[in-house]
């Protein structure tokens, strides 16, 4: 579901931006500090209620303002949505969808599935397991409406269990938490396992397209020993958990691992190859969403030319075209985009930014 219009007020150095957007490729060009990344960040914020760069609102609001405002129109074949989000320095958020208050960020996220490809996004591969769990859970959030409530309740119960650990004297005092925790852990793990297995061939196929020289293999690890009953694991690990102050094993420790030639990819691949692999993962997941749910996914790509040679850039552009998705790409100059042959497509749009303002 593409954005047809985007208005940004007082978001970082973007004080007043009004864009009529293409449903295909939108290129944002400008020198460092012009606001290119901030524009992508604003779109991301509109779809997630948070930034991919900072969790501190005061760093995002323009220094002369008390709040920032984001507004967009979202077009689908038979529907149109109007979305507005405002955040002030106290951290209060006002969200409206089609003029209605009381909406949740989850409602907005369901409306705007998006994938982000940035230089910092390599943490998906060389960061901790939490980044890869988030990758899986993004897909499940958009595939299964019930997943969000399972996941949120699981997090709540784990937090309560961890808080109770230093206060209880015996395991029997934790059983009330663990009965429900085990149920939710099995539900979340079953959904993650099935989704990971369904996504695996799509990822491996896309990896062969970008990295034919390296066989990439993916595997899901549930967070405790395969075949073991999680209820027994919790009971047997009570003293250990109590000593360290948190629940050591479970779905909160799950991982989705990537290997090349039998070794972790972060130990084998160059930065350029890691970036290609990250692109392949994001593309495969976005394409899988289109196939399974008939829903388009937005792609936000920052610093497009970084660490990719011209041939790989053209390959990425070609695959993005094939998805039929709306794409936002930043680059320092239009020349960096020439490898994509974007001039051939009449619906594409090019925007020039300078010091937070659109150049006309």
Curated annotation (Swiss-Prot):
Gene3D superfamilies: P-loop containing nucleotide triphosphate hydrolases (3.40.50.300), RecF/RecN/SMC, N-terminal domain (1.20.1050.90)
GO molecular function, one term: ATP binding
Residue pairs linked by disulfide bridges in the UniProt entry: none
Listed GO CC annotations: cytoplasm
Subcellular location: Cytoplasm
InterPro entries: DNA-binding_RecF, DNA-binding_RecF_CS, P-loop_NTPase, RecF/RecN/SMC_N, RecF_2
Protein name, as recorded: DNA replication and repair protein RecF
Organism: Haemophilus ducreyi (strain 35000HP / ATCC 700724)
Classification lineage: Bacteria, Pseudomonadati, Pseudomonadota, Gammaproteobacteria, Pasteurellales
């Amino acid at each position: 579901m593409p954005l047809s219009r985007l208005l940004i007020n007082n978001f970082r150095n973007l004080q007043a931006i009004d864009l009529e957007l293409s449903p295909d490729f939108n290129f944002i060009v400008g020198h460092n500090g012009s606001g290119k990344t901030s524009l992508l960040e604003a779109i991301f914020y509109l779809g997630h209620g948070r930034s991919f760069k900072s969790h501190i609102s005061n760093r995002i609001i323009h220094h002369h303002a008390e709040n920032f405002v984001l507004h967009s129109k979202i077009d689908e074949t038979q529907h149109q949505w109007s979305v507005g989000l405002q955040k002030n320095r106290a951290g209060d958020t006002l969200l409206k969808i089609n003029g209605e208050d009381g909406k949740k960020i989850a409602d907005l996220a369901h409306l705007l599935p998006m994938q982000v490809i940035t230089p910092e996004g390599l943490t998906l591969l060389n960061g901790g397991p939490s980044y890869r769990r988030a990758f899986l859970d993004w897909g499940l959030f958009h595939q299964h409406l019930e997943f969000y409530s399972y996941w949120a309740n699981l997090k709540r119960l784990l937090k309560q269990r961890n808080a109770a650990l230093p206060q209880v004297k015996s395991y029997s005092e934790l059983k009330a938490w663990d009965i429900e925790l085990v149920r939710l852990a099995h539900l979340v793990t079953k959904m993650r396992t099935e989704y990971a297995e369904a996504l695996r061939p799509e990822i491996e196929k896309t990896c062969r397209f970008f990295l034919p020289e390296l066989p990439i293999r993916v595997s899901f690890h549930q967070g405790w020993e395969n075949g073991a009953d999680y209820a027994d694991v919790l009971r047997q690990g009570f003293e250990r958990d109590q000593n360290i102050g948190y629940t050591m094993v479970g779905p909160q420790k799950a991982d989705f691992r990537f290997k090349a030639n039998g070794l972790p990819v972060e130990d084998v691949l160059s930065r350029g190859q890691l970036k290609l692999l990250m692109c392949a993962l994001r593309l495969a997941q976005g394409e899988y969403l289109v196939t399974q749910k008939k829903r388009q996914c937005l792609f936000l790509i920052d610093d497009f030319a970084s660490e990719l040679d011209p041939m790989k850039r053209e390959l990425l552009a070609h695959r993005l075209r094939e998805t039929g998705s709306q794409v936002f790409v930043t680059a320092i100059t239009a020349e960096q985009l020439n490898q994509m042959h974007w001039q051939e497509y009449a619906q594409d749009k090019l925007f020039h930014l300078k010091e937070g303002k659109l150049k006309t």
